[in-house]
């Protein structure tokens, strides 16, 4: 794990030294001495616009011309236009710096802050850069046994020179705690499905949350049957691995404080069931529990900070497998709410899991607000690509807050429509509703949202986040490698702070 330190006095023991230059290409007053020490290397570089323009995110790694001393590289990072800098951009810049240092095999980095930023305190700037670097340091290579030494290389430490190291370290500790919650979400999402069975996943939740003072209850199939959870149980009945409902309760607020319920889809592996998916890219269905992982990660972050809020998390953990005992297209299931659903497509299973999970959360905990998170539809990826998650809500204020926070932490949401005509499309001839719409390939994400909406009680504020396009990525970003992104943890953690 990357070691991050904040110190008041500069050290010359780091192999790489980072400096920041904006698009005006002017040296900070605190860089003049350093530039002279390195025989004008920084000033010469920024005077040559073919080498460096100062645009945001540009990183230039230059071998030092000094033969003595520990500093082997100067790393010049472009800030762009200071007025356009956001906290999210500063964080991503920290990730880019770490990635370039890793590529150049620089094991220790010193970071010299800039004097040219007036909109952020030096403590805030330093903690954000450190947070981005820490997030970018994540790896999932536990099953790779033949890695070459060069592939194993990782930056060991970052040392940030700041005039208030104690205060900056306090800010970073909170960000580090949140990042570690993101790492749990990434880890469990990246885990192969033959390892993370519903039972194993549930055990990992217990092991991670109980030491933080979170009450965790793991409900098995017998109890779910007694509760009438026919929708969730129907999805998992084709698997030899027993389905689980994991209930997490964090009581950090007063008894009369409102409860926020987070509900996550945890389909450990989704073959599509009898409505079998194509084999191409089916292996990516190990990420179909990304919503549940985001819920667990959020509760880790909230409980770790001991926030004064009441949060409950409910995640349904199932495997959607074909077998002689699997659910069939045309089956009718009775949900915990008493409503019935005709299963016309067994690959539209996530909404069935959520139907019972959101109802359970409302019945037991009487929350003021319910937010469900799910890799629910391929249709949302067609609509929004891999940039935005879809946000459906019955409350404009709730949706606006979520979208605002999403912009702040760079986990973007786009408001999607709800309409009575969409709701009418899931009416069934033989049951209360069907799990797909009656117009093929039409409004798939909206149809799925309306299915869940039928299980939200009157007076409950509700948002549904369809994260199918953003939960995992086939390419690296500034804040992490390809694979599980950990989307939703930072969004929901920040929302909870602001909402309460």
Curated annotation (Swiss-Prot):
This is Probable cytosol aminopeptidase. The keyword Protease applies. Presumably involved in the processing and regular turnover of intracellular proteins. Catalyzes the removal of unsubstituted N-terminal amino acids from various peptides. The keyword Manganese applies. It is an enzyme of class 3 (hydrolase). GO terms for molecular function: manganese ion binding; metalloaminopeptidase activity. GO terms for biological process: proteolysis. It catalyses: Release of an N-terminal amino acid, Xaa-|-Yaa-, in which Xaa is preferably Leu, but may be other amino acids including Pro although not Arg or Lys, and Yaa may be Pro. Amino acid amides and methyl esters are also readily hydrolyzed, but rates on arylamides are exceedingly low; Release of an N-terminal amino acid, preferentially leucine, but not glutamic or aspartic acids. HAMAP family: Cytosol_peptidase_M17 (MF_00181). Its cofactor is Mn(2+). Pfam families: Peptidase_M17, Peptidase_M17_N. Mn(2+) 1 binds at residues 270, 347, 349. Binds 2 manganese ions per subunit. It comes from Rickettsia peacockii (strain Rustic). Signal peptide: none annotated.
């Amino acid at each position: 794990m990357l070691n991050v330190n904040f110190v008041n006095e500069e050290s010359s023991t780091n192999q790489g030294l980072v400096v920041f230059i904006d698009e005006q290409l002017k040296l900070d007053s605190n860089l003049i001495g350093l530039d002279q020490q390195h025989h004008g290397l920084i000033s010469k570089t920024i005077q040559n616009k073919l080498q460096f323009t100062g645009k945001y995110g540009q990183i230039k790694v230059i071998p030092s011309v000094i033969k003595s001393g520990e500093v082997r590289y100067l790393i010049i990072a472009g800030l762009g236009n200071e007025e356009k800098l956001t906290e999210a951009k500063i964080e991503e810049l920290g990730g880019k710096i770490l990635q370039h240092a890793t590529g150049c095999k620089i094991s220790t980095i010193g970071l010299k802050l800039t004097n040219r930023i007036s909109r952020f305190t030096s403590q805030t700037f330093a903690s954000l850069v450190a947070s981005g670097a820490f997030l970018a340091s994540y790896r999932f290579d536990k099953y790779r046994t033949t890695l070459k030494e060069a592939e194993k290389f990782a930056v060991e430490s970052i040392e940030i020179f700041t005039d208030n190291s104690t205060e900056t370290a306090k800010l970073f500790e909170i960000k580090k705690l949140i990042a570690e919650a993101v790492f749990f979400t990434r880890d469990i999402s990246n885990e192969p499905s033959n390892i993370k069975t519903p039972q194993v996943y549930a055990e990992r939740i217990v092991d991670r949350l109980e030491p933080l003072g979170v009450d965790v209850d793991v409900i098995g199939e017998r109890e779910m049957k007694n509760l009438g959870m026919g929708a969730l149980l129907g999805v998992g009945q084709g698997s030899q691995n027993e389905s689980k409902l994991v209930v997490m309760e964090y009581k950090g607020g007063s008894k009369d404080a409102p409860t926020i319920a987070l509900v996550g889809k945890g389909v450990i592996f989704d073959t599509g069931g009898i409505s079998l998916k194509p084999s191409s890219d089916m292996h990516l269905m190990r990420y179909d529990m990304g919503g549940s992982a985001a819920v667990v990660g959020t509760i880790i972050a909230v409980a770790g900070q001991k926030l004064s809020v009441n949060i409950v998390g409910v995640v349904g953990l199932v495997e959607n497998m074909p077998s002689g005992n699997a659910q069939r297209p045309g089956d009718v299931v009775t949900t915990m709410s008493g409503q019935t659903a005709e299963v016309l497509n067994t690959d539209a299973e996530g909404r069935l899991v959520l139907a019972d999970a959101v109802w359970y959360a409302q019945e037991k905990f009487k929350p003021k607000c319910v937010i469900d998170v799910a890799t629910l539809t391929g249709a949302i990826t067609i609509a929004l690509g891999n940039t935005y998650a879809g946000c459906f809500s019955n409350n404009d204020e709730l949706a606006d807050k979520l979208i605002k926070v999403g912009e702040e932490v760079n986990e973007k949401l786009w408001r999607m429509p709800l309409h009575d005509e969409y709701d009418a499309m899931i009416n069934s001839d033989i049951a209360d509703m069907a799990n797909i719409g009656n117009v093929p390939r039409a409004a798939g994400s909206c149809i799925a949202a309306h299915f869940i909406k039928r299980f939200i009680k009157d007076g409950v504020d509700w948002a549904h986040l369809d994260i199918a396009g953003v939960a995992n990525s086939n390419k690296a970003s500034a804040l992490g490698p390809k694979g599980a992104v950990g989307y939703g943890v930072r969004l929901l953690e920040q929302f909870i702070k602001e909402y309460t």
